């Protein structure tokens, strides 16, 4: 195993370790004394479920924590391994944070979140193309009101620039990221046709917040 391969693995594990910090779990237990698994209809330890169940401030706290843990993992990887790996170090760490958030080891690799915030942070910190992908995902959510569709569109929209601009390795890592997001959101997406998938009117939530 080459030194650069070891560096890639370490970057991923750094991200995975930080990704295991479940901000939603901390916020929910702080405010309710209960685990996030008992919160709302889904029990998902993510911003959307916390915001729907506990309000805007709690949701923003979760959003902030998930952004910080992903960005911090990418920064640390860049500082330690950036000289040898360049921006690859950031992507491996960010991907590790997404996997850690989705499959936290302290929850026995289950009951993790869906990784939307971590995914967005990874893409935005990595490249302006990532910001465009996130904007496209946000527009999709505003139009459809389905968070699960946006969660799939965001990494999928980054696939073309990943291969065309950054090369095959980033492209393949983005395929992994897209597949991970697809697997996490597909169960909810399948319920759209039956009308059982919960809608989230983000714009309406923001309007109500401004009136308060």
Predicted feature locations:
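N-terminal signal-anchor transmembrane alpha helix
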Residues: 2, 6-32
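Short, non-helical or kinked segments that cap or interrupt transmembrane helices
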Residues: 35-44, 107-120, 146-154
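Alpha-helical transmembrane segments of multi-pass membrane proteins, especially transporters
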Residues: 12, 16, 62, 66, ...
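Multi-pass membrane catalytic core of lipid/isoprenoid biosynthesis enzymes
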Residues: 46, 52-78
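Interfacial segments of multi-pass membrane proteins
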Residues: 51-54, 77-81, 100, 114-145, ...
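Cytosolic, membrane-interface loops and tails of multi-pass inner-membrane proteins
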Residues: 26-57, 111-112, 190-212
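Helix-coil boundary and interhelical linker segments in multi-pass alpha-helical membrane proteins
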Residues: 1-14, 72-92, 124-132, 162-173
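C-terminal ends of transmembrane helices
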Residues: 24-27, 98-110, 138-144, 186-190
């Amino acid at each position: 195993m080459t030194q650069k391969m070891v560096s890639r693995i370490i970057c991923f594990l750094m991200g995975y370790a930080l990704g295991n910090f479940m901000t939603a779990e901390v916020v929910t237990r702080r405010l309710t004394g209960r685990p996030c698994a008992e919160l709302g209809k889904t029990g998902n330890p993510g911003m959307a479920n916390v915001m729907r169940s506990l309000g805007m401030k709690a949701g923003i706290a979760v959003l902030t924590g998930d952004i910080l843990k992903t960005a911090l993992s990418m920064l640390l990887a860049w500082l330690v391994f950036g000289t040898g790996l360049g921006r690859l170090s950031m992507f491996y760490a960010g991907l590790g944070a997404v996997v850690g958030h989705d499959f936290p080891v302290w929850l026995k690799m289950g009951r993790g979140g869906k990784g939307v915030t971590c995914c967005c942070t990874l893409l935005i910190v990595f490249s302006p193309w990532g910001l465009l992908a996130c904007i496209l995902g946000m527009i999709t959510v505003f139009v459809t009101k389905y968070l699960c569709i946006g969660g799939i569109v965001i990494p999928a929209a980054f696939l073309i620039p990943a291969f065309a601009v950054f090369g095959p390795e980033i492209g393949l890592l983005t395929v992994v990221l897209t597949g991970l997001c697809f697997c996490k959101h597909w169960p909810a997406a399948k319920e759209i046709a039956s009308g059982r998938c919960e809608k989230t009117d983000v714009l309406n939530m923001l309007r109500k917040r401004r009136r308060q």
